[in-house]
Amino acid sequence: MKKCAMKKYLIVNGDDFGATRGINRGINQAHRCGILTSTSLLVNTPWSQEAAELSHTSPELSVGLHVHLENGVRKLNSGPSQVRTALDEQLLRFQMFVGQLPTHLDSHHNVHRDPELLPLFLELAQRYGLPLRDHSEVHHFSKFYGQWSEERHLEQISTGSLTRMLETEIEHGITELACHPGYVDPQDTSSYSVEREAELWALCEPRIRHVLAAQSIQLISYHDVPRLLAGAAV
C-alpha cells in the first residue's frame, strides 16, 4: 500500500447493527452526529429490517454482514456444509434487506477466527470479493471496548481514552476501529449495556474531530477501500 501508507485512514465500524432498537438508534446517531462511518448488520433478529431501512437514509454509511452462528452450527456437528449453508443464507438475507452485497464481512464474537470456521469465511469473502476482518489490507483495532476480563471498564471508552488511542495507536494505512455504540433498552440482554451509551457519547464528542484533524487522520468507510487500494497499487 505505497500511496495508502502515506496517510492514516480510519474506518469507525459499529458492530451489532440490528441487534435491538436501541442499538440501531445508537449506531444511527453515531453516524449522523459522530465519527462512525461504517456498520455491520445482523440479519437474523426482529430488528434487522429496521436497521437496513435506517441505512438507506445514510448512503455514505458502509454496511457489512455481521454473521451470527448459533452454537449448534458453530460446532460443525453436521460438517462444513451446514456452516456454508448458514453463511449463504445470511448473505442472501442481507441482500434482501439492503438491496446489495455487503461492503465487508465479519462475525458476532469474532467466531470467524475459529480455525475450523475460518476457511469457510475466507471462501465466502473470496467468492464475492469482500474484505474479511483480520484478513484484508484493513488493520483491525479492537481496544476501544469497555469490558476486559469480565469486568466493566468505562474509562477505556471515555473521550480521553479515545483521544489517546487516536493520538498514539492509529497506524499509517487503513485502520478499522471497532465499536459498539447504542442505547440501553429492554431488548438488550447482553452484559455489554451501559458501555454502549458510553461509547456513543465518546464517538459523538465534537473534540474528537479536532483530534483527528491534528493527527492528520482521514475518516473513510469501506466504500472507499477499493479506490484507495487501487491507487496504492499504481
Question: Language-model segments: what does each one mean?
Answer:
Residues 6-21:
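Boundary/entry segment of secreted carbohydrate-active catalytic domains
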